[in-house]
A protein has these predicted regions:
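C-terminal functional module detector
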Residues: 22-70, 74, 81-131, 168-171, ...
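Acidic, metal/ion-coordinating pockets
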Residues: 240
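Aromatic- and acidic-residue-enriched carbohydrate-binding clefts of CAZyme catalytic domains
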Residues: 123-165
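Conserved, charged catalytic cores of large soluble enzymes
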Residues: 222, 232-236
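Long, charge-dense tracts
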Residues: 217-219
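Gram-negative bacterial Sec-dependent N-terminal signal peptides
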Residues: 2-23
Length: 644
């Protein structure tokens, strides 16, 4: 085990002791009430949540101005009204079912401590950079944001002031106090059957500014999570995080998983074909990654990582959420070039995983897909008409937030309108409890949306047909096939998929349902194909040149409104792969596309009377979407194929 991983496990005894001194529940009551919740026979509905939310405990969020903490975050997500940092009253139209507060493990609560410190104490530390940041944080919101931008760049470049890194024992004690109080609060707000509050943190690994961040999510309550401290990203590596998670599980009997995010800002490093330090990926490394990271965050405020037009030129809808974010890494200190894109985007990673599995016998990139917000306002909302911004500096009270530059570094290129109002995670579970939702993540029976709450279901098998819709097709899906996230063993005939999509009951109609297939061909080359398998008005929208025509557009740009006069409320099909080849390794996932609707930028333009630039106005209407987790088709062992 990495020494650092061991250190952060052993220090958890301090956390647990501090938390136990507070108002927390007894250790032996972890998960109280979960055993009394009546569970469905099969997962019967998607539970909606956000696994990536920051509060004033995050070093950047506080510096960017947020003054709401974990309690306000839990209140807001569970449907209560709160007052945003800028003074506006904020409430979700529909509460979430679960939440992971994922404050950065590095410097947990540090900017608040620096801000609250007496200036003479900072002067006494003898570091000019820290004193300058302190003064900037107190000068104005704009200067505070600039200070945090410098701090993040310094962390990425390994140039943080020594005063911030040379006293780990003091930092650990401060972290333990904050972490313990946070865990106690989560257990108080966790209401099995009504609202699930998960412990978690963000591991912020960022070599040279390239985003390799993960959210760590725990299945457990205070009695187990209180035995660890959040694992830091500074001066560590990804295998150290996995060792930390394994040590936690072995010592406590608990469970943890890691969720990579913003691969689009990794400059090709997130889904490499080599080890992080160079050389070919080993089977051991692939096994560790597959075990630790069953899902990936595909969409969020800082862009969408599903696909890129350069990698998928035949997919006319591959450019969603790409603008601005494809320019470079997170702080824009390094440009992104075309040769890096394959390591940035999830469709390509899924394809690479097939190739690696053929070589190694294990697939390190066999992950499900979720969305989340990465909001730094303590407000988990992925709704276009209720978008509270990435951070406090672009909450709705700032009328020009769509036009302002959003650059942590010095290069110009990203603007407020590049932010997406999304996304959410949907978990198919038998009930709203920590155990049920976490287990759905673990088995990859989850899907992502860019904000709307569409209901998407996917089953794969070998004997499904349209006739199954007339019976209990959900039972058929589970008993005769596998759900999204599952694996099928090749039987020598083409797989068939039961695909069902229902519109968000409070949202837009559906344009189409697509299947994305990736495979390794007989020459060992990676291939992909996109199939339109069901769409609205199929009798009127016949294919032209092999393509389904556009659904139309009802958005009124002058009022930021649309109508559901086009599209369909429900789309479903039993689809059989027409290009199946026996023994071919493949994956299939579903992409559900809505009709065009206004983005938050258009709502702002109408609300505040703003004239958007031409490029922003062209992007002010979008087709929101959902991405299912894949189903993998694996070659049967030779002995089985010979018997068939």
């Amino acid at each position: 085990m990495h020494k650092q991983a061991k250190r952060y496990f052993l220090l958890g005894a301090v956390t647990f002791a501090l938390a136990a001194c507070g108002q927390g529940v007894d250790a032996d009551q972890q998960g109280t009430g979960e055993g009394t919740i009546e569970l469905a026979e099969f997962p019967d509905r998607p539970y909606w949540g956000d696994t990536h939310l920051h509060t004033d405990n995050s070093i950047d969020a506080f510096g960017f101005g947020v003054r709401l903490g974990p309690e306000e975050a839990l209140m807001f997500a569970s449907g209560q009204e709160v007052t945003a940092t800028t003074g506006m009253r904020a409430k979700l139209a529909r509460p979430l079912d679960f939440l992971v507060i994922s404050d950065h493990s590095d410097g947990l609560g540090a900017t608040r401590r620096l801000y609250d410190a007496p200036r003479l104490g900072v002067v006494a530390m003898g570091d000019e950079t820290m004193l300058r940041w302190y003064d900037m944080m107190h000068e104005s919101p704009e200067q505070s944001q600039r200070a945090i931008g410098e701090l993040i760049t310094a962390a990425a470049n390994g140039t943080l002031p020594e005063a911030m890194t040379n006293n780990p024992e003091e930092q650990d004690a401060a972290t333990a106090e904050i972490w313990g109080a946070h865990l106690e609060m989560l257990d108080r707000y966790n209401k099995p059957g009504k609202f699930t509050a998960f412990a978690g943190f963000e591991y912020t690994l960022m070599p040279d500014g390239n985003n390799l961040h993960r959210v760590v999510m725990f299945r457990d309550g205070l009695d187990r999570t209180g035995q660890v401290l959040p694992y830091p990203g500074i001066n560590s590596d990804i295998e150290g995080l996995w060792d930390y998670m394994l040590a936690y599980e072995q010592a406590t009997g608990g469970q943890a998983l890691a969720i990579p995010h913003n691969s689009n800002l990794s400059n090709g490093l997130m889904f490499e074909l080599t080890m992080p330090g160079g050389g070919p990926i080993t089977a051991e490394y692939a096994r560790k990654r597959a075990a630790a990271e069953p899902v990936v965050e595909v969409t969020q405020i800082k862009g969408d990582s599903e696909a890129h037009p350069f990698l998928s030129p035949n997919d006319e809808m591959a450019g969603f959420g790409v603008k601005g974010w494809e320019l470079g890494n997170l702080p824009l200190t390094r440009e992104t070039t075309n040769d890096m894109l394959a390591g940035n985007y999830i469709r390509e990673a899924l394809k690479r995983g097939l190739s690696l599995e053929e070589q190694l016998g294990v697939n390190p990139y066999a992950f499900g897909m979720i969305g989340s917000t990465d909001s730094h306002t303590s407000l988990a909302t992925g709704d276009e008409d209720n978008f509270y911004g990435k951070h406090t500096g672009n909450e709705p009270s700032y009328q020009d937030r769509a036009l302002e530059g959003q650059n942590l570094g010095t290069r110009i290129g990203r603007f407020g309108w590049h932010y997406l109002a999304g996304g959410y995670a949907a978990a198919w579970a038998r009930g709203n409890t920590r155990a049920e939702i976490f287990d759905a993540f673990q088995r990859r029976e989850v899907y992502a949306t860019t904000g709307p709450r569409m209901t998407v279901r996917l089953f794969g098998g070998f004997d499904f047909s349209e006739a199954d819709w007339d019976g209990d097709w959900v039972r058929a899906g589970y008993t005769r096939g596998v759900p999204m996230g599952g694996e099928l063993e090749d039987r020598g005939n083409a797989p068939t998929f039961l695909i069902s999509a229902l519109k968000d009951p409070d949202g837009a109609n559906l344009d189409r349902v697509q299947v994305v297939k990736g495979w390794v061909d007989s020459s060992g080359e990676l291939q992909e194909r996109l199939y339109d398998v069901s769409w609205s008005d199929m009798d009127k929208r016949s294919r032209v040149g092999g393509k389904v025509p556009a659904v139309g557009d009802t958005v009124d740009r002058a009022t930021a409104t649309y109508t559901n006069d086009i599209g369909a409320a429900e789309l479903r099909t039993a689809w059989t792969d027409p290009d199946y080849v026996e023994g071919q390794r493949a994956f299939y996932y579903v992409r559900v596309i809505e009709i065009p609707t206004p983005r938050w930028t258009l709502f702002d333009a109408v609300r505040f009377g703003i004239e958007l630039p031409e490029d922003a106005m062209a992007d002010a209407v979008a087709q929101e979407r959902a991405y299912s987790s894949p189903i993998w088709l694996k070659p049967a062992p030779p002995a089985i194929m010979e018997q068939q």
